[in-house]
Amino acid sequence: MIPTHHRSIETVDLTIAFGQGNQRRQVVDKVSFTLATGEAYGLIGESGCGKSTILRALAGLNSDYQGAILFSNKEQQPLRDKPFYRQVQMVFQDPYASLHPRKMVCNALLEPLRLHGMDRQEERISEVLHSVGLSDAFRYRYPHQLSGGQRQRVAIARALIMEPSVLLLDEPTSALDVSVQAEILNLLSSMRKQRQLTYLLVTHDLAVVTHLCERVAIMHQGKLLEELTAEAIRHGNAREAYTQRFLAASEA
């Protein structure tokens, strides 16, 4: 049990459905979990299990849900306010799609600073680029001039430039080559330690989730089946039959 004053993210009976009338389908079914401040926590499962839908609700991108979402013990309204996004940022699966093709890197990084009225804008851009392993020269490039790994570094920089306390990570390495995946995972790991960030990671990749996370929730058909430590996953120690099959299939 995580003490109340150490809680960063919490969902209570989170339920989400899409469609109308007879076509309405429940995709998340009374999901509850709690993250400690500074923890890296993973949601893993097959495509369509509801994990990305949960992440979008947490980020305020889907306001049609039942149950409660809390950050730092404060229940959030379905429509988030501007201060919320100073504390909570999201990194998406496809870095090319999440960056405006006609905006240079400097403009992509400057936009949130202006929106929130933050000072030292040029210094902040240089600092955050260096923190993700990119030189100042990259500020004058467009997304199509960057490799996949460089684009994802820019996307991470754009999230970090707000100095948030929480990052929501939606399959942040799945669109990248295997060699680049390791670089981005190591970057995310070092950023969490340096900045004392809380991570909620959504992925279908066991290697990714055990590399980055301490605890992992197994999702299936909209339900949270069980929580395991990364160590338990590495050793295949699961209680639920579905989880045992999922772990075995992932190792095959």
Task: Describe the residue ranges of each PLM region.
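ABC ATPase NBD coupling module
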Residues: 21, 63, 75-89, 103, ...
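Conserved ABC ATPase signature
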Residues: 142-146, 150
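C-terminal boundary and immediately downstream tail of ABC-type ATPase nucleotide-binding domains
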Residues: 235-252
